[in-house]
Amino acid sequence: MTDNKDDKTISVAGKKTLTLKPSGVTQGTVRQDMGRGRTKAVVVETKRTRSPLKHKDERPITPVAAAPAAARPAEQRPMPPQPSGRPAPQPQPHQPRQEQNRPRGGVVLNDLSASEMEARRHALAAAQIRDAEEAKRRAEEEVRRRREEEERIAREKEEAARRAAEEAARPAVEAEKVEEKVEAATPAVAETRPLSERPAPAATPPAPAGVAPRGRRAGEDEEGERRHSSAGAPRGKVVRPEPAKPAPRAKGDEGRRQGKLTLTAAVDEDGSQRGRSLSAMRRRQEKFKRSQMQETREKISREVILPETITIQELSQRMSERAVDVIKFLMKEGQMMKPGDLIDADLAELIAGEFGHTVKRVSESDVEEGIFNISDADDEMHARPPIVTIMGHVDHGKTSLLDAIRHANVVAGEAGGITQHIGAYQVEQNGQKITFIDTPGHAAFTAMRARGAQATDIAILVVAADDSVMPQTIESINHAKAAGVPIIVAINKIDKPSADPQKVRTELLQHEVFVESMGGEVLDVEVSAKNQTNLDKLLEAILLQSEILDLKANPNRTAEGTVVEAELDRGRGAVATVLVQKGTLTPGQIIVAGDQWGRVRALVNDKGEHVKSAGPSTPVEVLGLSGTPAAGDRFAVVESESRAREISEYRQRLAREKAVARQSGSRGSLEQMMTQLQTSGVKEFPLVIKGDVQGSIEAISGALEKLGTDEVRARIVHSGAGGITESDVSLAEASNAAIIGFNVRANKQARDASERAGIEIRYYNIIYDLVDDVKAAMSGLLSPERRETFLGNAEILEVFNITKVGKVAGCRVTEGKVERGVGVRLVRDNVVIHEGKLKTLKRFKDEVSEVQSGQECGMAFENYEDIRAGDTIECFRVEHVTRTL
């Protein structure tokens, strides 16, 4: 037993005392009132006596619980035993001590017999003896445990001291090894001193809390002594000592913030600070050595490849320099830039030279290198057919002449009987092939004729014998001279009665075309396409000229040539008519034509037959391109799709940049555009043009641009080869434009969309009609012309003031006549002071429509009465006349 209330030790240690249950005694439970509405279950024993009489007031009783030893010390002494016939009942082990100390209440118990009291005293004495033995055993165990703990702590201290000594000596050994490697003596000796030689900071406490050994608190020895001294105290709860608070950290003490906690720092009782690591010491020594020896890093000069534009960040990466250094250099030059800013190649070259690098400048156009103008060896050259272009004025019989040579009828297939496409054909004469290119003669097809002249070897100038030299004839002569190709004059229509070939030769002299009959070198042949007269002579002249030119090409190389025409066919897709000038083109090859590329799916000749190859001077249709190239673009075969795609993307980007530059140059800023509209007042006629081939669209665009004036002009919103689609209608609706289809039609979706949007679609197959209709429509945008016709003058003799009418001028007509309702001007001292309309015109008292010269009349003006005698009235009529382009 003990006085400590906190002692949780149960006096009866879980062992149930063996008791002999007396006969005639029954146990039960009752609810005992605890007060304030609380109850508890109480075990009671009922004793039945053998006497025949029962006590009427007999009630169940409960065993008396053992009171605490501290409350009743007198009961701790054993009482003298009394004889009893049965053993005393033991207290229930499951009842806690608090319940034993609780005062009785609620139920009045009967007095126990002497034997029962004696038995209970014996049980209580035995329990007290067991408690004393248990307390003694626990005290012995506590002393033994403390002794073992002290021994373990002593061993840990010795081990920690040994490790601390090793850690303190290791930096000194390592520093000596590093010092031997350093050639020059350095003042780094102070850094290599062992940690044990460093003076401890004065402000550091001898045993800081942050470095205390694990499992051991400050003042533990004193606590151990205190526990030894109190070993004989009464048994109770072991009071744990509170950990000592860490001493306040002195100013400048880094504590645990410098690095991690190690065993060396934990047992460092002298308070020395944590030392620098070995790698840090090596870095410091190497840095000091370089500074002492003034060692400089070797500059590496690199070859920097510079495109046309480059960012500062990318330039610095190519030079292996820091972008900050490049920006500093630019700041010194007076330019404030960011790493992401673009600079041109000139500035980039200046920067690279400043940093000591060499520069190699490249251009985006380098992707096109090696695909054109590849030189061929002379022994690989073979003779090729001549390429002949037929040129001349419209309706002079160019296509008819070619039809007669080919024995075909192309004129019947052309709308209006005029050629609106470039046609490429190949004929054979005496076993030799000749390639013909037919060009349009209309004025709108100037670009086509120019392309035909550039891609040709010989130009045939067709001149009608009855029409002589015409404007497009002169233009064809100029194209041929600009291309540097020889000319053969074919004087056509000699079968007509009005034909005069000599007149043609004479007029050609004015344009520096000297035929052989006039002492020149130009061949001339009189032919008739209708009657097929002298066609063989013309072909012989062509072959003779080709022999003089000695035309050769290398067929055993990649193909190269010119796009003659391109169109978008519904069933075949993009189709380009090309003229192979060098090499041989075969299906499956990858070609680049303008800004389009593709793999050749099929080759079709001028007769509609599929061919397996196309050699030099052979015209073929190419299927398989990604889009329609522009007529006149050059094509070439490349080795891979990636190369073709790269070239195509580069050319498309160039085309976009040119279009943007053209728009920005013509449009400028918004203020400039508004100023231009206010000053010039130019009206635009928007159009969406779709044609069958690219060349026709180009001709239409050129013809419409020529119609523009200072007041109105045609603006082509979109143009392309192919049929009219729903997207074209949407574009026309957004831009309020009209749609023109040249030899193409709109599909059903486009027609339905145009009906819903109210967009007009006009179809044409002759360029004359298209240009005339657009010209008439553009004329409607012109403001009408104001024409003024002088009628006569009248002199004011007197001014009358009439009621309800106002001032009326009495006049005499001095010149011409005066009409009512016409425009009048009031002239005073030769200065026009008013211009308006004549309201009233009377002769005597009658209203008249006009007054002739020499007669007198009365006049009144509309909304004007400042008239005086002596003023002159000038009458005129204004007419508005519709203007045309």
From Swiss-Prot:
Composition bias type Low complexity, residue spans: 63-77, 184-201
Pfam families: EF-G_D2, GTP_EFTU, GTP_EFTU_D2, IF-2, IF2_assoc, IF2_N
Major location category of this protein: cytoplasm
Alphabetical list of PROSITE patterns matching this protein: G_TR_2, IF2
Region (G3): 438-441
Record flagged with keyword Cytoplasm: yes
Chain residue ranges for the region called G4: 492-495
Region of interest (Disordered), residue spans: 1-295
Cellular component terms (Gene Ontology): cytosol
Composition bias, Pro residues: 78-94
Family: Belongs to the TRAFAC class translation factor GTPase superfamily. Classic translation factor GTPase family. IF-2 subfamily.
Protein name: Translation initiation factor IF-2
Organism field: Sinorhizobium medicae (strain WSM419) (Ensifer medicae)
